[in-house]
């Protein structure tokens, strides 16, 4: 049998009443805990024989290391077993007059308050799973044992008036301590008791916890919002800061009310000291510096339209450009409508005026051409008159003995006689025409309009036949021309067009003839007269030839 010494606990602090200190000195000798749950009819080594017993019922003689009165599972006994005191010692986790191994005298068992039942059961009703007046291991309860609903906290929850048990967190003021049972959570009160495992330091920090939710029925599997919880620290003379963790939520329902259970972990298995929460994610910014989340619907908006349109804010530069484009398009539409309503009569009038101006220009060109022809004729007549004047002057200046050499007067009179002859012929023709006309007037003939129509038709047909023959001859000439050019191209290897001068005659350059003045004493009159007579003779011959 192990006998504890009188030394103090590690760290020099005496264990407080109701709390467990590592290596604390008990007040008196302790008895070993009873066996798990039930007593046997035959005592074990070092124990007296016992009477008959039932499951979870007290027996006369306990088993090895158990009290004399064998209790039910977690219930006190009346008779101690081998190596135990004569007083009735509680089972594991229950209050007794004599404490168990490592627990001070006149205090509660491991992790439980005084005057409490055994591990997981109550003293009044020792049956398995039946309601009891006190809670299970580590926390006070008013109703149920293991597996039954209770009015207060269950496994691992701290008491409302004492220090926390082994491994149970010490919550702050006004916080709801999560439990590990199937009952509702209990509201704990502030406490300053030292933790169950440590060196007398006060646990003022909390560690992360992961609650597991068990609800009635078969529910969903989710991760609700993180919860800030507190738990006792297992470190040595250190504190930890409050941190949050993602809870673990299940939808398992066992036919009881919803109860949130906390599996508290701290110290060695918790987050490092001084570690803060994760920083918030940066806001996503879209194109143009516009917050994309600003245009998204909020969580509370349940309005659903029939047609969802994706709309985003457009930068001011693009809006200005679009507005300018719209104004330009509107202006162009206005101009187009004005053009569409404009009448084309003005353009028609202008085209008519242009045509009239073209006809007037053609008439003016004809008049100018006639005037030019008259000018040329007058110029020729002026030249002839000058030549005649020079001839007369030279004839007068020539002496009488030399007149046989001067033939200019003879040519002059010859041309003059020829001209008179032509004029007489022309006059005779005019006189004959006049006589016929007068004869026709004096002797009228009956000519009907049909005769005139017939005569004009015959003239028209004759002109058409002549035009057809002329065209036929022209085609033959063109064929001979092409044949000749091909022969020159293939036989003589000459690609030049010999008919180019005929097809495209150069424009004649008309130079104004020099009009000389009368004879002067300083000029060579004989040379001028000879030239003048030669020019006059050539012009006269050309005139007679024409």
UniProtKB/Swiss-Prot annotation:
Coiled coil: none annotated. InterPro entries: NUP58/p45/49 (IPR024882), Spt5_C_dom (IPR024945). It comes from the Eukaryota. The keyword Transit peptide does not apply. Residues 22-200 are annotated as: 17 X 2 AA repeats of F-G. It is found in: Nucleus, Nuclear pore complex. O-glycosylated; contains O-GlcNAc. O-GlcNAcylation increases with increasing ambient temperature. One of its GO terms (biological process) is nucleocytoplasmic transport. Keywords: Glycoprotein, mRNA transport, Nuclear pore complex, Nucleus, Protein transport, Repeat, Translocation, Transport. One of its GO terms (cellular component) is nuclear pore. GO terms for molecular function: nuclear localization sequence binding; structural constituent of nuclear pore. Pfam families: Nucleoporin_FG2. Sequence repeats lie at residues 22-23, 36-37, 45-46, 64-65, 73-74, 82-83, 92-93, 101-102, 110-111, 119-120, 128-129, 137-138, 146-147, 155-156, 166-167, 197-198, 199-200. Contains FG repeats. FG repeats are interaction sites for karyopherins (importins, exportins) and form probably an affinity gradient, guiding the transport proteins unidirectionally with their cargo through the NPC. FG repeat regions are highly flexible and lack ordered secondary structure. The overall conservation of FG repeats regarding exact sequence, spacing, and repeat unit length is limited. Belongs to the NUP58 family. Component of the nuclear pore complex, a complex required for the trafficking across the nuclear membrane. Together with Nup54, required for transposable element silencing regulation in ovarian follicle cells. By interacting with the nuclear (Nxf1/Nxt1) and cytosolic (fs(1)Yb) components of the flamenco (flam) transcripts processing pathway, enables export and subsequent piRNA production. Component of the nuclear pore complex. Interacts with Nup54. Interacts (via C-terminus) with fs(1)Yb; this interaction occurs in a RNA-independent manner. Interacts with sbr/nxf1. Interacts with Nxt1. This is Nuclear pore complex protein Nup58. The gene is Nup58.
